[in-house]
């Protein structure tokens, strides 16, 4: 008599890079015959992939761990907060195992110890798709090209959690991308901690893909991805000079004209305290140059207000810079101290919470006006949209200017579309975040 199929529940928190880690773990478990179930009650064990970047993320991770313990009782913890095992066990001493980020084998081993795999599992019958298990909709996928980061930003603890930059061989990355495209993926979202540094640790060594030599470097990676016939979107791009190399690829339609560059601030004084590059004037000149080459270029960024030592003058400098930069998509966070971050030792004056809140509100209002004006320029134009979902009100999609979950939507007045469709539309209306359109 065959043994019951072991069942695993999975909760994935945090950024897209953590989501890719979750996909890798789930793919291995499925290859070993485990069934992935969507509810706590159906699972024999639950894995929680945590985020530990800021205090609010840690609080959410602890809350979800507690929920999983209450609903199931057998919980394994992994991910970025796993480097703080004591903090997890102080609150939830009953967790079965705690592992850190990228510790895939340890997570799978911990699952084995709680719920052994089926001894009669036949991997030739229980097939896993060639692209692996994906937690995103079928038509888009995240493509992680490296782990870790070589920067030492004072507000960040990512290097201590995920280590120094380790680039994947370009042949492996391109082979994975090819499998995803063959499986029906229509948009590849390239992610890492520092996409523009890809290959630095390998000294840009030449690898092979489909028998052809390819350098392990951002430009060559993008050239190869751009030949696969799908949308390719770049995230987490540090503004090195080599970013200039990919703008012509965007202008030629090989890559989406979209750059996600986390600037964090504009004041030279604050950037110095953050240990970020302070070339804000040269950055504005580069924006101008990029837009001359590729007029459709969308630039998204994230910023932090209320960093220790930030004055009203620094904040006003940031607002003025935003006016000059005319960014399309922007996120903003109030500074939150992170345990272990170098910023805690700078001895700078903390910004009061009420001042942080006031600056955040002013920042958002300022940028919303910029974003609204830029989106209004699209009214009447025709663009291509990738449909994400369809409901009774119509279809919801995204343009080249919209990454999933963090940017805006394009609401299309049609009931004849389905997720994964690409459709040409005419923009009829806009607000500060979203567009409305009708099929052409």
UniProtKB/Swiss-Prot annotation:
Its EC number is 2.8.4.4. [4Fe-4S] cluster 2 binds at residues 149, 153, 156. Residues 135-373 form the Radical SAM core domain. It is an enzyme of class 2 (transferase). Keywords: 4Fe-4S, Cytoplasm, Iron, Iron-sulfur, Metal-binding, S-adenosyl-L-methionine, Transferase. Residues 6-116 form the MTTase N-terminal domain. It is found in: Cytoplasm. One of its GO terms (molecular function) is aspartic acid methylthiotransferase activity. It comes from the Bacteria. Residues 376-440 form the TRAM domain. Gene3D superfamilies: Methylthiotransferase, N-terminal domain, Nucleic acid-binding proteins, tm_1862 like domain. GO terms for biological process: tRNA modification. [4Fe-4S] cluster 1 binds at residues 15, 51, 80. It catalyses: L-aspartate(89)-[ribosomal protein uS12]-hydrogen + (sulfur carrier)-SH + AH2 + 2 S-adenosyl-L-methionine = 3-methylsulfanyl-L-aspartate(89)-[ribosomal protein uS12]-hydrogen + (sulfur carrier)-H + 5'-deoxyadenosine + L-methionine + A + S-adenosyl-L-homocysteine + 2 H(+). Its main location: cytoplasm. InterPro entries: Elp3/MiaA/NifB-like_rSAM, Methylthiotransferase, Methylthiotransferase_CS, Methylthiotransferase_N, Methylthiotransferase_N_sf, NA-bd_OB-fold, Ribosomal_uS12_MeSTrfase_RimO, rSAM. GO terms for cellular component: cytosol. Binds 2 [4Fe-4S] clusters. One cluster is coordinated with 3 cysteines and an exchangeable S-adenosyl-L-methionine. Its cofactor is [4Fe-4S] cluster. Belongs to the methylthiotransferase family. RimO subfamily. HAMAP family: MTTase_RimO. NCBIfam families: 30S ribosomal protein S12 methylthiotransferase RimO, MiaB/RimO family radical SAM methylthiotransferase. This is Ribosomal protein uS12 methylthiotransferase RimO.
């Amino acid at each position: 008599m065959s043994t019951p199929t072991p069942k695993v529940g999975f909760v994935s928190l945090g950024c897209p890079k953590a989501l890719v880690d979750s996909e890798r773990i789930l793919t291995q478990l499925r290859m070993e015959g485990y069934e992935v179930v969507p509810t706590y009650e159906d699972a024999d064990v639950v894995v929680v992939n945590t985020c530990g970047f800021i205090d609010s993320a840690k609080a959410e991770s602890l809350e979800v761990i507690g929920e999983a313990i209450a609903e199931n009782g057998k919980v394994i913890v992994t991910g970025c907060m796993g480097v703080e095992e004591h903090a997890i066990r102080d609150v939830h001493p009953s967790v079965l195992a705690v592992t850190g980020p990228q510790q895939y084998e340890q997570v799978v081993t911990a699952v084995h110890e709680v719920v052994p795999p089926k001894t009669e599992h036949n991997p030739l019958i229980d097939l896993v798709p060639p692209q692996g298990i994906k937690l995103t909709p079928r038509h888009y996928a995240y493509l992680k090209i490296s782990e870790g980061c070589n920067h030492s930003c004072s507000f960040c603890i990512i290097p201590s959690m995920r280590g120094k930059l380790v680039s994947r061989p370009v042949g492996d990355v391109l082979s994975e991308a090819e499998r995803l495209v063959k499986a029906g993926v229509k948009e590849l979202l390239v992610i890492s901690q520092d996409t523009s540094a890809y290959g630095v640790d390998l000294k840009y060594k030449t690898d092979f893909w489909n028998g052809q030599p390819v350098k392990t470097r951002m430009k060559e990676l993008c050239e190869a991805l751009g030949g696969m016939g799908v949308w390719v979107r770049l995230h987490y791009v540090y503004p090195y000079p080599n970013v200039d190399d990919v703008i012509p690829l965007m202008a030629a339609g090989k890559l989406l004209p979209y750059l996600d560059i986390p600037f964090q601030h504009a004041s030279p004084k604050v950037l110095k305290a953050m240990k970020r590059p302070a070339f804000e004037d040269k950055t504005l000149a580069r924006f101008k140059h990029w837009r001359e080459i590729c007029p459709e270029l969308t630039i998204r960024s994230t910023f932090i207000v209320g960093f220790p030592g930030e004055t009203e003058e620094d904040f006003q400098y940031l607002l003025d810079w935003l006016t000059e930069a005319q960014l399309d998509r922007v996120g903003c966070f109030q500074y939150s101290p992170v345990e272990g971050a170098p910023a805690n030792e700078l001895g700078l004056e903390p910004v009061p919470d009420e001042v942080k809140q006031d600056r955040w509100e002013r920042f958002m209002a300022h940028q919303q006006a910029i974003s609204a004006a830029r989106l209004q320029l699209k009214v009447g134009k025709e663009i291509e949209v990738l449909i994400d979902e369809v409901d009774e009100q119509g279809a919801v999609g995204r343009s080249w200017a919209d990454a999933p979950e963090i940017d805006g939507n394009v609401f299309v007045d049609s009931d004849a579309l389905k997720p994964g469709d690409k459709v040409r539309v005419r923009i009829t209306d806009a607000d500060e975040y979203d567009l409305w359109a009708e099929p052409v």
